[in-house]
Amino acid sequence: MEHIYQYSWIMPFIPLPVPMLIGVGLLLFPTTTKHLRRIWAFPTLFLLGLVMLLSAYFFILQLNKSYIYQYVWSWTINNDFSLEFGHLVDPLTSIMSILITTVGITVLIYSEKYMFHDQGYLRFFSYMTLFHVSMLGLVTSSNLIQIYICWEFVGMFSYLLIGFWFTRPVAANACQKAFVTNRVGDFSFLLGILGLYWITGSFEFRDLFEIFYNLVHNNEIPFFFLTLCAFLLFGGALAKSAQFPLHVWLPDAMEGPTPISALIHAATMVAAGIFLVARLLPLFIVMPYILNLISFIGIITVFLGATLALSQKDIKRGLAYSTMSQLGYMMLALGMGSYRAALFHLITHAYSKALLFLGAGSIIHSMEAFVGYSPEKSQNMVLMGGLIKHMPITKTSFLLGTLSLCGIPPLACFWSKDSILNDSWLYSPIFAIIACSTTGFTAFYMFRIYLLTFEGHLNVHFRNYSGKRSNSFYSISLWGNEGPKTLQKKKGFKTLLTMNNKKGVTFFCKKIDRIDSSVRNMTRLFTHFEAKNTLPYPHESDNTMLFPMVLLVLFTLFVGAIGIPFNQEDKNLDILSKFLTPSINLLHEKSNNSVDWYEFIPNATLSVSLSYFGIVIASVLYKPNYLSLTKLNLLNLFVKGGPNKIFGDRIRNRIYDWSYNRGYIDTFYAISLARGLRGFAEFTHFFDARVIDGITNGMGILSFFLGEGIKCVGGGRLSSYLLLYFDCVLLFLFISSFLYLFHF
């Protein structure tokens, strides 16, 4: 067995020849390489598939017998210092390797068609391959130095992919924002590594954990300094996994191509932070304050991400805030010491979120066919609707991903999320209440995304569409009924429907049920036809894009089975519990109690009930707009609803403004940090130019005039020199007499 494990170091390097050959081909044979660009997708998939098979083989070996293999090469620089490089294969490495490769293969298959017409096709596949190489190197690293090197490579290629369409100013700014925000976390991570090395004298995990544990229990190092080093290490994960308050880069990262959004949010960049905390959890366990901080940051991120997703119009940005919230669940679990639950949710969320992003990419790809390449239009959910008839496979896949993320049984995320919620009751009832209530928010905003995208009818065909929330009709698509501004104008229902149209439209006739007869009849009432031809509609995506989505549907349906919490005769029978090291599950060690069905079912009933409640609320507010018009007429009867109605509208608008403006956190950073630093830079420029340079230049000018004065006095005549000498003596005598008389 050891003979097989010693070749595991080659895993990260297997896909590396493809980007190298692409680079050589572009240098030597640029025309031919670009002409045969589609050929390069096949070796990329083949080599990544080999890595997946190798990872699966190691997974099976470790499942049969838990075995941790580490191989180290020592590079001695001098007698006092040496660097050690190696690779580590343990259950965490196997899980992450399979996750990266399976999600990566589906995304690459999808990208082959999605990026087919893009001029940067070869550049995209090169970046994607190097991204996988960096992430595989990260998860197989045996020490902190290797992790930091691969950590920086993961960040670099993610920035290149976020700013892939760098000619668009928005994409370039998003890349810059991600880079600057992660610089804060990476610098913190580097300081933590250096601090730990100064304390322990080692970068290797095994030695590091043992020495650190002894230092804490023997009080050989000040506890504050140990806590500071641990906090600095956590700072790296804080930024990389988009945890509050360094989460601001993640929504803007949606400016990159949709396949890279799927990869970043599912199994690579944001997962790197969770992996780092999981890898260093033996170190954090002996620092209770750090564990409490991790769980506190996690619960804040859970709630904040869910609330900020409530009113997003951009479909990818809504999913980005969803990722932020789900990463908060994982961080909460790690802070509680629930190692198994965190990794379980990392696995299930990866497949569900990859499915959702690929579904969103399929929708965007189809919308671009007739709205043109404009992210403001093709990604705007207010312009969508009615896609259920035109994209049935995408709709079914997206619905299953949505239900999974909402925590609806028996889909994958139900089992993992409820494991975290069940453990949260053991850790802190307050955290458990917040985490459970957030499941309702999750179900609400995810079904809001689904309903606005697929239900109803295609909204882009409306002539009086306006993206502004003050619009009289489309405020329905934001909160389910008219905004307060429309209600206060006291316009009748017929007036509302005839605004900006040449002819009035009669909606309420005797046969109201004909409203649902067909899409053409529905849109005819609102659409001004230049010709009698029907308008184009989105079409289902190509089979090359649908195949990966179907694969991810299978994972979403069945991957939850690896962690179903069976418990018989004090033996955990689920695959994940058997696979992971049991001693690291700190929470259950403290409680001296394992999770079983008697605890799981009541807690799951509560969370599922809240999820269904969120789904019902979303269905009431965001069901198809045309079916809601009778309800809108009923609302107009209560225009003069009194102060309670006005107060409710104000509260609703405050919530909407908070969510749509990202909690004003970006604005706060722009004012306090960006403008503050700019003001400080202007002040330092003024101080340097006027004060520092003023003193230097002033001394020069003073010396110049002093020299000129002396030059004028010294004309070469002896009488002038004697007169000057006599004046100086008199001045000296005068000052001396003055000091003597007044006793100074």
Swiss-Prot record:
Protein name per Swiss-Prot or TrEMBL: NAD(P)H-quinone oxidoreductase subunit 5, chloroplastic
Protein source organism: Pelargonium hortorum (Common geranium)
A biological process term (GO) from this entry: electron transport coupled proton transport
Catalytically driven reaction(s): a plastoquinone + NADH + (n+1) H(+)(in) = a plastoquinol + NAD(+) + n H(+)(out); a plastoquinone + NADPH + (n+1) H(+)(in) = a plastoquinol + NADP(+) + n H(+)(out)
GO cellular component terms, A-Z: chloroplast thylakoid membrane
Subcellular location: Plastid, Chloroplast thylakoid membrane
Predominant location category: plastid
Membrane topology field: Multi-pass membrane protein
Family named by the database record: Belongs to the complex I subunit 5 family.
Enzyme Commission numbers on file: 7.1.1.-
NCBIfam families in the record: NDH_I_L (TIGR01974), PRK06590.1 (NF005141)
InterPro entries to which the protein is assigned, alphabetical: NADH_UbQ_OxRdtase_chlpt_su5_C, NADHpl_OxRdtase_5_subgr, ND/Mrp_TM, NU5C-like, Proton_antipo_N
Gene behind the chain: ndhF
Function: NDH shuttles electrons from NAD(P)H:plastoquinone, via FMN and iron-sulfur (Fe-S) centers, to quinones in the photosynthetic chain and possibly in a chloroplast respiratory chain. The immediate electron acceptor for the enzyme in this species is believed to be plastoquinone. Couples the redox reaction to proton translocation, and thus conserves the redox energy in a proton gradient.
Residue ranges of the TM segments: 9-29, 41-61, 89-109, 125-145, 147-167, 185-205, 219-239, 258-278, 280-300, 327-347, 354-374, 396-416, 425-445, 546-566, 600-620, 722-742
Molecular-function annotations in GO: NADH dehydrogenase (ubiquinone) activity; quinone binding
Key word NADP present: yes
Keywords, sorted A to Z: Chloroplast, Membrane, NAD, NADP, Plastid, Plastoquinone, Quinone, Thylakoid, Translocase, Transmembrane, Transmembrane helix, Transport
Pfam families named in the record: Proton_antipo_C, Proton_antipo_M, Proton_antipo_N
Assembly description: NDH is composed of at least 16 different subunits, 5 of which are encoded in the nucleus.
